[in-house]
A protein has these predicted regions:
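Basic, helix-initiating cap at the start of DNA-binding domains
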Residues: 1-58, 62, 75-82, 213
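C-terminal peripheral helix-coil segments that are non-catalytic and often amphipathic
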Residues: 2-23, 179-237
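Alpha-helical structural segments
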Residues: 36-44, 48-49, 79-95, 105-113, ...
C-alpha cells in the first residue's frame, strides 16, 4: 500500500467511526436521565426519609449521575419537590366529576381517592398544603371540583369555599394519625391523672380502623351540612 493509499484508508476509518450509523450502534450503559426518573427517585426518597432527605447531591448519587446534570431538568430543589407533589396529585381519581354522579356522591368518592393518595405519601403533604401554584395536576384537581360544584348550581363563591373546605379536611386527616398518637403502654395513662383514658393504650393497634372510621364520620357530617346549605340555596333561587 502506497503512502497516499494509507492516508486515504485511515481517513475513511476516521469518517466511518464518526458517522451517524456507527454512533447509533453505541448504547449508554445506564438509561438516559429524564424528568420522570428524577421525580420518581425523589418521591421514593421523600416517602422513605422525608423532605430533608432530598438534595441535588443525594439525588445525583441515587441516579448514578453528576449533580450538574440535574439542572438540565430542574433549577432548584424546590422545583423537584413541587414536581413530586404534582405527581401525587396526579394519582387522585377525578372520573366521578365526569360520569354523572351527583355532587354529594362525587365529593365523597373524590375525598376517598384524595385521602388514599396522601395516605400513601404523607411526607409530601406539607408541600401540597401550599396550594396548587402552577402545578398542572393540582390545578386540574381544583378545576374539576370547582367546575362540578358550579355545574350543580352552587353559587361560584360557595363552590370556591367547598373546594377549600374539602382540601382542609382531607389534608388535615393525612397529616397524622389520631390513634397512632397514643403509646401501647398502659402505665402511661395513670387513672389518677387521666381517668377517662384507661383503654388508650389499645388505640395504636387499631390505628388504621379507627382513623378510617373517623374520616368517614367526619366526611359524612361535612356532606350532611353541605346538603342542608344546598337546599337553602335551591329554595332561595
Amino acid at each position: 500500500m502506497t503512502a497516499c493509499e494509507d492516508r486515504t484508508f485511515k481517513l475513511a476509518l476516521l469518517v466511518s467511526s464518526r458517522s451517524p450509523t456507527m454512533c447509533a450502534m453505541a448504547r449508554p450503559r445506564k438509561p438516559l436521565l429524564s424528568t420522570d426518573r428524577i421525580v420518581e427517585t425523589a418521591r421514593v426518597l421523600v416517602d422513605a426519609e422525608g423532605l430533608a432527605a432530598v438534595s441535588t447531591r443525594r439525588l445525583a448519587a441515587e441516579l448514578g449521575v453528576s449533580g450538574p446534570s440535574l439542572y438540565n431538568h430542574f433549577r432548584t430543589k424546590d422545583e423537584i419537590l413541587e414536581a413530586v407533589a404534582d405527581s401525587v396529585s396526579a394519582q387522585v381519581d377525578l372520573s366521578m366529576f365526569e360520569d354523572g354522579r351527583d355532587w354529594r356522591t362525587a365529593l365523597h368518592d373524590w375525598a376517598l381517592s384524595y385521602r388514599a393518595a396522601l395516605r400513601d405519601h404523607p411526607n409530601i403533604v406539607p408541600v401540597l398544603a401550599r396550594g396548587p401554584g402552577r402545578r398542572p395536576a393540582g390545578l386540574r384537581l381544583a378545576d374539576a371540583v370547582y367546575g362540578a360544584m358550579v355545574a350543580a348550581d352552587w353559587p361560584p363563591a360557595q363552590a370556591t369555599s367547598i373546594g377549600a373546605l374539602m382540601r382542609y379536611f382531607v389534608m388535615g386527616s393525612a397529616l397524622g394519625s389520631f390513634a397512632g398518637g397514643f403509646v401501647d403502654d398502659a402505665s402511661a395513662y395513670d387513672p389518677a391523672d387521666y381517668p377517662h383514658l384507661g383503654q388508650a393504650h389499645l388505640l395504636a393497634e387499631q390505628q388504621e380502623k379507627i382513623d378510617e372510621r373517623a374520616f368517614e364520620t367526619g366526611l359524612t357530617a361535612l356532606l350532611d351540612g353541605l346538603a342542608l346549605q344546598y337546599e337553602q340555596v335551591r329554595r332561595a333561587s
